[in-house]
Amino acid sequence: PYSDLKRVQRWVYENILLKDLSSVSPCAEGFMPKDKDDIRNIVTNARRHARSKWLINVDIQDFFDSIKYDSVWEYFSKLGYEEEVVDVLTKICTYQFRLPQGAPTSPMLSNLIVRSMDDAFVELADKFNCIYSRYADDITLSGNSDSIMPSMRDIYQIVYAHHFRPNKK
């Protein structure tokens, strides 16, 4: 984004999105600000699954591009802003009706917007007594049972239900 737009996006990130950090799923390991009390990164993501016998990893195709204007609008609306403010915030944070790569707001918005998908995966993980985490666009489930694990169909069903596509390459 242009430098003036980027400055405004940083303001939105620091003054709106970071104040809603508690709404990010505890299973989201990517795009988290550094915090000595709650360190979440690619290493902590891998550690969650290190002792598991099996592991399933699914990459979401075109992650930011898949998060549309309407989802961003809905997120800001839920924060209680008036419609005009929601419109402006959404326009500041999207480009061509999607979350743009490289915008300071996109990573945190993605974490906040996909909370319902994270919750659905936590439910699936609980059902199969396994571990779930998401690092940015990478979904990981792991466990120790030799016979019980979620099927790819179960996983894809959640991905598709939240308007994403798995990268099957």
What are these regions (language model features)?
Residues 47-136, 140-169:
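Conserved polymerase palm-domain catalytic core
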